[in-house]
């Protein structure tokens, strides 16, 4: 019996334009996995498509077919063993040839493939592996032409993309370039074995009181002969300590056993408890010899989506281990247009940044990819819950038999691959495809429950979302929650705020409402909303190489903003709210102020609504990240540099947060007449699971003088309810008497100042914010850490620190009021480094 061995084929590859027959056409590939754009860049054949207008000069790559080749030695194959060629992912139309013979054809980027090549490698010595990648751009157009009866409609990119199981954003999106990659985008290897564990999974049943858990462990086994002489030894461990061991025989090709765990340690989202991960290991043995061994980590937890009738309609919120959790977080797009650029370390940094920002959920958006294992592993370990879309986005997908078969395989493969991750708490059928159905007037009769009839309508994709995918989820992960689409709610119009989840784009897109009323526009769960902002100057310096192009409306900057109508939308929100500027650095800052304020108004109000019978169950901003250096809705740019909005969201999502706001007065529709009076409200939100006693203070500070215009209001011994909202007080501002002033709120618990909020008169453009008397004093310094004290004579709006690589500030986008010194810790800034630059409104 030969034990399992594998040989990764990462070196020795070459590639060429498939149509180039010249002898010097072959170019070297530095390493695999890779995609063709990287390999062309490595050979000096392509300029970086992320710089300037280079995306345009890279378009020729999109229209070519490519061939990759590797000459390898046949590995040693013990008697009774077979040899398999394994691809974890091929992008996308791939024909694989071994020594000139076709052994595999693939047309789905999201599938892995295994080919038994034992007979093909009968001859010892060298063998030639060749992969032809046909042009996906042209193949998609051919497929669309072959199916004229289908209604090819959608948002973003060429609608021919709907015919191909490839990352949809490769066709371009309203935040990303058109870069049609091709290549071996995941690992390729040779596996030699007589027996192999092909799958290992667990099913966890947790007692309602959490006193015990029953874990069923199962392993699927593949053998090259009779399998009944093998046994499987399962081991359950926690933090390296074995807590259970069981031996099972094979029943067919599956071995199963159970473990009972008393007083189990549970997996929790960050901020609610530990992210405990157990390890299940299985060893496949025959006659005391080990043939193969596999381990996976998993968590013990329950995850529910609570949808029940209430006074607001029908709830939509998450309950983990019996605890209701407000899901503040963000949507995730692929972190690079060239996917093989992304390292496990980069994934880890993204997820750790979310936890630093008090975010507990990330939504893997349906126009990208089922993410890499290291992404989900980071989410498991850091405690970020995953909302997982299936890979369908913004379109009316076709359903001819071959593509349905491919989609079913794709769904089952990725469900199996990812089912052990406790962070994944929901599977969702698509992104905005029901909105395409609504806007295009496609047939959707929710009362019709016959899946076969859906295939005959002009919206056949319903069959995928309401039949094929839920069936696959039920088959592979029976305990998982499935939701047909995002947004979607019981078959009602997707903008219905009373049910399901909602994408609220009437700030920025749509009716372009004032961001100050964002919280009034939400629904039961706000799974998309956003506001664009420029990235920091250091990021713009990276892709704008000509100094003459560094002005706000330059061609290069417009080219790197893919959102339709971005000029007028950015201009609208700037002109409505701020004194505008043409200097690029100031302009960047102003767009960032607008984004930070927009996110704050949305999250602050929606989190408050959580305490009103779970009126709002969560808010996932669009978007966390970028796939290239660009101007977009991201709150952290391509280089992991947070924009001010990141810090604004972080403060609002702290375990304890205080909120104060005056009622909105729409100056644009009242001839800019000021209101005579304004009501204001003060409240505290808590995600803590126990009641706490706090002290609350509200001050009224003149913007002009920095002096108090009224006595402070102080409430001692305030009982703050757990996991909800505590309304503290309300009042009225008399504008005939009171000069323009801020409402400055603070919260103390056990003598510690834990939260602040400052409400300002709107809009900022009417305020004189000069001569603020800001002082920034360094009060402590070590080789790698500095603490700054911030104070001001008059209220300061949105103090933003420069973002430098490998330097982290504990807070930014800060409002400062007199008599309330704040402290910011800077890590990674050395003694010899120049101090961080900063900006504030009116500077």
Curated annotation (Swiss-Prot):
Q: Which reaction does it catalyse?
A: Hydrolysis of terminal, non-reducing beta-D-mannose residues in beta-D-mannosides
By its UniProt entry, which InterPro entries does this protein fall under?
Beta-gal/glucu_dom_sf, Beta-mannosidase-like_N2, Beta-mannosidase_GH2, Galactose-bd-like_sf, Glyco_hydro_2_Ig-like, Glycoside_hydrolase_SF, Ig-like_fold, Mannosidase_ig
Quote the pathway field. Glycan metabolism; N-glycan degradation
The catalytic site is made up of 432
Transmembrane stretches in the record are: none
Signal peptide residues on this chain, from the entry's feature table: none
The pH profile of the activity is: Optimum pH is 6. Active from pH 5 to 8.
A GO molecular function annotation here is:
beta-mannosidase activity
- Tell me which UniProt keywords the record has, alphabetically: Carbohydrate metabolism, Glycosidase, Hydrolase, Polysaccharide degradation
Catalytic class of the enzyme? hydrolase
Family, as annotated = Belongs to the glycosyl hydrolase 2 family. Beta-mannosidase B subfamily.
| Extra remark | In contrast to clade A beta-mannosidases, which are likely secreted, clade B proteins appear to be intracellular.
Q: What's this chain's function?
A: Exoglycosidase that cleaves the single beta-linked mannose residue from the non-reducing end of beta-mannosidic oligosaccharides of various complexity and length. Prefers mannobiose over mannotriose and has no activity against polymeric mannan. Is also severely restricted by galactosyl substitutions at the +1 subsite. Releases the terminal mannose residue from mannobiose, mannotriose and galactosyl-mannotriose (GM3), but not from galactosyl-mannobiose (GM2) or di-galactosyl-mannopentaose (G2M5).
Q: What is this protein called?
A: Beta-mannosidase B
**Name of encoding gene:** mndB
